[in-house]
């Protein structure tokens, strides 16, 4: 928990801000689910005044969750958005997500009104003319069997990638 000057800073920040977004660097690399530390810290951050938590570090896409803060607010948590652009070689590391969050402010306060996660994949294609690799982050919905066949990592079929994404993005 927060004590002393940390508590004063937090309270002052909350007074000055309409909405607090926290970007923790946390989690266990290559895990598809948040670990106990992430779950505990997410709740502590929510209770301390965070309105939205967007995590990173595990290099994998992890679930999205809604927490109830101590004051009753709903707090959206993206535990990890994975890699947007990467040269890691495992399928779980080639997947990521782009978060889209609509924040509204009205007479009742400021809150998340809508949110979604658009799954992405790193496609790595070899340029036949130069021999260089071309790295292309793209939406998973645009990933075709033709692109999968050209991908540097042949295990990344559309079916395998879609299954891995569904497994990684179960809601906590």
Residue ranges: model-predicted function:
Residues 2-11, 164-171:
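Conserved small/polar residues in nucleotide/adenosyl-binding loops
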Residues 25-29, 59, 82-84, 120:
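Active-site beta-loop-alpha junctions enriched in small/polar residues
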Residues 93-167:
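A short C-terminal boundary segment appended to hydrolase-like catalytic domains
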């Amino acid at each position: 928990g927060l004590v002393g000057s940390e508590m004063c800073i937090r309270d002052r920040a909350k007074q000055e801000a309409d909405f607090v977004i926290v970007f923790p660097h946390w989690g266990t690399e290559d895990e598809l689910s948040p670990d106990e530390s992430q779950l505990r810290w997410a709740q502590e951050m929510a209770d301390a005044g965070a309105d939205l938590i967007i995590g990173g570090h595990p290099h994998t896409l992890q679930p999205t969750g809604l927490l109830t803060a101590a004051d009753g607010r709903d707090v959206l948590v993206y535990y990890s958005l994975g890699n947007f652009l990467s040269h890691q070689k495992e399928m779980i590391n080639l997947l990521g997500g782009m978060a889209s969050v609509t924040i509204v402010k009205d007479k009742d306060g400021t809150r998340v009104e809508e949110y979604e996660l658009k799954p992405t994949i790193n496609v790595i294609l070899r340029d036949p003319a130069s021999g260089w690799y071309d790295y292309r982050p793209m939406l998973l919905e645009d990933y075709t069997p033709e692109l999968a066949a050209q991908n540097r990592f042949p295990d990344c079929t559309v079916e395998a990638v879609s299954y891995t994404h569904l497994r990684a993005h179960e809601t906590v």
